Amino acid sequence: LFQKKINFHNLGYIIIDEQHKFGVKQRKNLSDKGGNNCDVLLMSATPIPRTLIMSIYGDMDISIIREKPKNRKEVITYSKLESKIKDVINFVKKEIDNGNQIFWVCPLIEESKKVDHESAVKKYKYLNEIFPNTVDIIHSNIDKYKKEEILSKFLNKKFSILVSTTIIEVGIDFPNANVIIIENANKFGLSQLHQLRGRVGRGHKQASCILMFKSNLSENARKRINILKNSNDGFVISEEDMKLRGFGDLLGFKQSGLKNYKLADPIHNADLFKLGEMEILRIEKEEKNINRYKSLLKLYDQADIINDII
């Protein structure tokens, strides 16, 4: 769809689901195919910082659906040192005894000499020794038909634990899966962790997410884990993500990055920006004599206004 050689006849409406999966340039290339009369709807459980700040600046209208589907409970999120894996195994045993299923997510398929991350294959072998005949594995190197077979078996409760890479991040719906364990959680971004956590809690039972980490956590990684533990709201998580990572370049293609402001900061003064947007709309609709704002507009055009104020 993004390729130049693909043209549309009278493209008028574009819906982009999981918008954080696409780059700024990709989204722009697609919307350009519709011209000036094309409407674009972006959908995501966790908007990227750049999208969030555009809504604050008034460049994008935003609708928030905060209600969960009926009978769904909040996912309880825990954090656990990887050295305490025996506690996690005991928890998993109880969940299996209660008829529940588990996702176990690892960042890599195979072990890497360069990166000290837990691999899915290694974890599969480890869990298969503890829970024989109740574990299977899925990752991107498995062919399409085998993946479908494994997922079908998991859906029909043929086994209890599915070890996986982040391939399950989107498009997976298994109501009986009530636990997700994420290895090396400190290596994932907030949006990805929230998306992975969303794979559980789709039934009526209480669901749990366990974020496993090594002892040498960075300050930002510790903040990310605490944010996930304290909130299930994707919009709140996106706001916190924006505070940590910044929002990038609004006029370019960078989707994150911190900016310095001498006056109002759109991250910490979001309410002020919204108030300003509402006032601009009111002036456009109600004010007939724009001349009363000449002095203000003149100040705005002066390059040294900020230095003068400070």
What residue ranges belong to the model's regions?
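Inter-lobe coupling/hinge segments of SF2-like helicase ATPases
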Residues: 1-226
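Accessory helical-bundle/CTD segments and flexible terminal tails appended to RecA-like ATPase motors
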Residues: 152-161, 168-175, 180-183, 198, ...
